[in-house]
């Protein structure tokens, strides 16, 4: 045949090449190590474990390198280890060169020692014994060539730079080679430990110095040094001694005979005390109330019956998390989480692949800390000097391909660290149980005013935040991303950490099935709202409650709800106010699910009070949580977005939605099932959190337990007739009201001068009719020079 057959080219895969190199280097390490260990001058080559070849190799290495020859097998072993980690060839060559410089430097430094005699048996039978200058045979620890290099007759380092210079130069080269081989992550860990130790010693030194200085000052002034009593009583004498060294300056000095000071539970929970009245006054269960009566008695918004009476002295302000009547975490079901032992080894393999991938693209970097969370694993990449961070960011898809990950997230750089964070899905994901978060919170010492126990971060740490500092929150995510579970977690966080006297809830659920089970909670101001008309009435009520609270704060000269709840009550001043002032203002949290459905039905009615509450309600303890599965620009408008700095993004459909909710892409790559990005005020980057999960059975058990502990008393039983135009008294309406309403709806013009001209009435009467139309929610509020907005259509109104 005229055609020649082409020879099939055989190409080896990179894995095979690395495996072959590893075996070769490991064999050389064993070969040289065994031959050196079994070598002796006075024995025949047959006694060497490697035979004649091993005896000859050992004789050559020991003659030229001396004792430093034993480092050569370690060099081959290090090369085998680098190939096992799949270190790229250029980086492996540089590390091997650094390791090869170590025996050379050691040989020169050993040659600086005078030729030794009377060596141990192990060295005497292995290092070269040479007769020089008709002297008795001596052992040269660094080998003959390096000794001649250091102290030869014609040319020597000792003659050129001296013994001190030679030692400094080769010692510096040796240290540089060692430091180059030490991993950067190991150095950073030791540096962090050293910094913490120095900081601890510094604080202790200054504490002792200040104590001694104050003691010496009192001794010089001939005064006995007696520390002032503190508000907190130590639990043991050893703790008392430590507290005396800290020299606290108490704000309030209490008599030592006060029996309340010996009650640890009351001391730990009390953060406000009144010196003239050390005893504590509490309300009986029959007098327990759900919401302070901040409204006038004749108002339609006030509850029918109230049991609040002004007290001569305020009760101590008890933190919400320590209330003894709240259900504990034991009520929830416990789930055992098992982590396989092979997880750490698998993550180390992923880290090696990550380092190899970066090196293949010319990025020299080390792998720092490896954190394993419930569903995510995070790697800290420590790039070398000169590496652009954006270059790592551009390799997101390539890194995901090599790590075989469904999606990854790159944080470039990590705020506050000289590192780049790479988050990948955990090979063994585990759900986050809400019971674990609640248990850690109830057992811990940190207490928040409006706690939200959301989940765990990528490194496994608990993540909870205070809604009082956020102060409003938007939650967005597609169906099945975990948005509804997050809302249930938020509600459970509030009701299991705060009594009904501290936090009240207003919940809007247009779906009518997700949150209606919370209607019987004692924390509820009103049953769960399911109609958009009732939602608007509830928002209007919250606006008026906000205005009333601001009036009370202005009258008392206070700035916020915290100062109101911790004030010292003056009965005479509060009695002069025209409305009854309660002892305490509870926080009010409004939760609105499916905001997009409400905005579709009545956009202006819903958006206007939401924006006003978001702008002003923080100081008086009213906070909003909005949730939507469609984070588009017509739902999360510019006004809403500007007044809601805190946002939670679950998995969204595309990059545009992620840009709307958290101002940057990334939410479209989340894994779903509770995987979220949390943006807080003042944060440099979104925090990735795995949301906690709580089952329906646990929710029902908690609701049943709370209903048995606290009575359910609604402040407003229903918003069906609240602020409803149809419920207005016809006698209060102007006789021309219906005619003016029809005229406004037909023409679309709602101005006082227009009605004055068309109806031929005076200005005062026309202005009164406009006010009645606004109260009936037919026209919007005045917007200055702009015309009033028409809120309803003519077909929707009945004559």
Curated annotation (Swiss-Prot):
Keyword Zinc-finger attributed: no
Chain segments annotated as transmembrane: 17-37, 52-72, 96-116, 129-149, 159-179
GO molecular function terms noted in the UniProt entry: ATP binding; ATP hydrolysis activity; DNA binding; DNA translocase activity
Pfam families assigned to the protein according to its UniProt record, in alphabetical order: FtsK_4TM (PF13491), FtsK_alpha (PF17854), FtsK_gamma (PF09397), FtsK_SpoIIIE (PF01580)
InterPro entries on file: AAA+_ATPase, FtsK/SpoIIIE/SftA, FtsK_4TM, FtsK_alpha, FtsK_dom, Ftsk_gamma, P-loop_NTPase, WH-like_DNA-bd_sf
Keyword DNA-binding: yes
Induction description: In infected human monocytes transcripts are present only on day 1 post-infection. In patients with confirmed synovial Chlamydia infections, 0/8 had visible transcripts. In infected human Hep-2 cells, transcripts are visible from 11-48 hours post-infection.
Subcellular location: Cell inner membrane
GO CC annotations on file: plasma membrane
One GO biological process term: chromosome segregation
Cross-referenced SUPFAM superfamilies: P-loop containing nucleoside triphosphate hydrolases, Winged helix' DNA-binding domain
Membrane topology according to the record: Multi-pass membrane protein
Keywords per UniProt: ATP-binding, Cell cycle, Cell division, Cell inner membrane, Cell membrane, Chromosome partition, DNA-binding, Membrane, Nucleotide-binding, Transmembrane, Transmembrane helix
Domain FtsK as annotated: residue spans: 460-659
Region (Disordered): 274-294
Main subcellular localisation: membrane
Cytoplasmic side stretches: 180-799
Amino-acid positions noted as binding ATP in the UniProt annotation, renumbered to this chain: 480-485
Family under the similarity heading: Belongs to the FtsK/SpoIIIE/SftA family.
Record remark: domains: Consists of an N-terminal domain, which is sufficient for the localization to the septal ring and is required for cell division, followed by a linker domain, and a C-terminal domain, which forms the translocation motor involved in chromosome segregation. The C-terminal domain can be further subdivided into alpha, beta and gamma subdomains. The alpha and beta subdomains form the DNA pump, and the gamma subdomain is a regulatory subdomain.
PANTHER family the record matches: DNA TRANSLOCASE FTSK (PTHR22683:SF41), SPORULATION PROTEIN RELATED (PTHR22683)
Subunit (UniProt): Homohexamer. Forms a ring that surrounds DNA.
Job of this protein: Essential cell division protein that coordinates cell division and chromosome segregation. The N-terminus is involved in assembly of the cell-division machinery. The C-terminus functions as a DNA motor that moves dsDNA in an ATP-dependent manner towards the dif recombination site, which is located within the replication terminus region. Required for activation of the Xer recombinase, allowing activation of chromosome unlinking by recombination.
Protein known as: DNA translocase FtsK
Organism: Chlamydia trachomatis serovar D (strain ATCC VR-885 / DSM 19411 / UW-3/Cx)
């Amino acid at each position: 045949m005229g055609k020649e057959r082409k020879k099939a080219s055989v190409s080896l895969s990179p894995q095979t090449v690395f495996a072959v190199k590893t075996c070769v280097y490991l064999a050389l390490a064993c070969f040289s190590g065994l031959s050196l260990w079994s070598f002796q001058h006075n024995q025949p080559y047959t006694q060497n474990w490697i035979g004649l070849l091993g005896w000859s190799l050992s004789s050559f290495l020991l003659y030229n390198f001396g004792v430093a020859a034993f480092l050569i097998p370690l060099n081959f072993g290090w090369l085998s280890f680098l190939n096992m980690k799949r270190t790229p060839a250029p980086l492996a060559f540089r590390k091997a060169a650094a390791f090869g410089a170590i025996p050379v430097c050691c040989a020169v430094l050993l040659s600086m020692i005078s030729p030794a005699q009377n060596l141990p048996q192990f060295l005497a039978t292995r290092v070269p014994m040479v007769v020089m200058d008709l002297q008795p045979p001596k052992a040269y620890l660094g080998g003959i060539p390096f000794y001649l290099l250091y102290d030869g007759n014609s040319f020597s380092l000792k003659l050129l730079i001296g013994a001190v210079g030679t030692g400094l130069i080769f010692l510096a080269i040796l240290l540089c080679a060692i430091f180059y081989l030490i991993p950067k992550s190991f150095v950073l860990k030791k540096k962090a430990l050293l910094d913490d130790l120095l900081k601890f010693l510094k604080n202790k030194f200054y504490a002792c110095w200040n104590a001694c200085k104050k003691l010496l000052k009192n001794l010089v002034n001939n005064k006995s040094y007696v520390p002032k009593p503190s508000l907190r009583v130590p639990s043991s004498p050893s703790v008392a001694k430590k507290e005396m060294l800290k020299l606290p300056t108490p704000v309030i000095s209490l008599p030592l005979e006060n029996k309340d000071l010996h009650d640890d539970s009351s001391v730990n929970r009390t953060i406000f005390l009144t010196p003239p009245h050390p005893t504590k006054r509490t309300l009986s269960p029959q007098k327990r109330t759900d919401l302070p009566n901040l409204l006038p008695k004749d108002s339609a918004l006030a509850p029918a019956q109230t049991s609040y009476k002004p007290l001569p002295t305020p009760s101590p302000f008890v933190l919400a998390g320590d209330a003894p009547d709240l259900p504990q975490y034991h009520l929830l079901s416990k789930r055992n989480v098992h982590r396989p032992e092979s997880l750490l080894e698998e993550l180390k393999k992923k880290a090696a692949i990550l380092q190899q991938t970066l090196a293949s693209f010319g990025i020299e970097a080390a792998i720092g800390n490896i954190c394993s969370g419930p569903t995510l694993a995070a790697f800290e990449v420590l790039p070398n000097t000169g590496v652009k961070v954006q270059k790592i960011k551009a390799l997101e898809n390539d890194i995901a391909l090599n790590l075989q990950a469904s999606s990854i997230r790159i944080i470039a750089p990590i705020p506050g660290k000289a590192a780049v964070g790479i988050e990948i899905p955990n090979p063994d994901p585990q759900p986050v149980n809400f019971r674990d978060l609640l248990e850690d919170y109830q057992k811990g010492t940190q207490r928040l005013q409006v706690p939200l126990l959301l989940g765990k971060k990528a490194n496994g740490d608990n993540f909870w935040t205070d809604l009082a500092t956020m102060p409003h929150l938007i939650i967005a995510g597609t169906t099945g991303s975990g948005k509804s579970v997050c809302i249930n977690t938020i509600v459970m966080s509030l009701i299991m950490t705060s009594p009904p006297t501290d936090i009240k809830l207003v919940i809007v659920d247009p779906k009518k099935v997700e949150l209606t089970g919370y209607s019987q909670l004692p924390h509820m101001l009103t049953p769960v709202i399911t109609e958009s008309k009732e939602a608007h009435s509830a928002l209007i009520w919250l606006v008026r409650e906000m205005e009333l609270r601001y009036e009370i704060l202005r009258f008392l000269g206070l700035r916020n709800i915290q100062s109101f709840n911790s004030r010292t009550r003056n009965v005479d001043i509060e009695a002069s106010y025209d409305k009854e002032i309660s002892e305490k203002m509870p926080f009010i949290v409004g939760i609105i699910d499916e905001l997009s459905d409400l905005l579709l039905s009545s956009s202006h009615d819903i958006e206007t009070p939401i924006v006003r509450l978001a702008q002003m309600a923080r100081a008086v303890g009213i906070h909003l949580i909005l949730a939507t599965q469609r984070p588009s620009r017509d739902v999360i408008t510019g006004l809403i977005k500007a007044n809601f700095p805190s946002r939670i993004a679950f998995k969204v459909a595309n990059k545009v939605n992620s840009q709307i909710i958290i101002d940057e892409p990334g939410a479209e790559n989340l894994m779903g099932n509770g995987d979220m990005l949390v943006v807080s005020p003042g944060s440099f980057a979104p925090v990735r959190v795995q949301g906690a999960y709580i089952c329906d059975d646990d929710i029902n058990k908690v609701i049943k337990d709370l209903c048995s502990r606290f009575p359910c008393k609604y402040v407003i039983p229903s918003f069906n007739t609240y602020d409803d135009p149809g419920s207005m008294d016809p006698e209060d309406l102007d006789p021309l009201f219906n005619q003016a309403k029809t005229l406004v709806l037909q023409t679309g013009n709602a101005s006082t001068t227009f009605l004055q001209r068309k109806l031929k009435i005076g200005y005062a009467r026309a202005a009164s009719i406009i006010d009645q139309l606004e109260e009936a929610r037919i026209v919007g509020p005045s917007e200055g020079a702009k015309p009033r907005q028409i809120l309803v259509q003519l077909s929707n109104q009945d004559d």
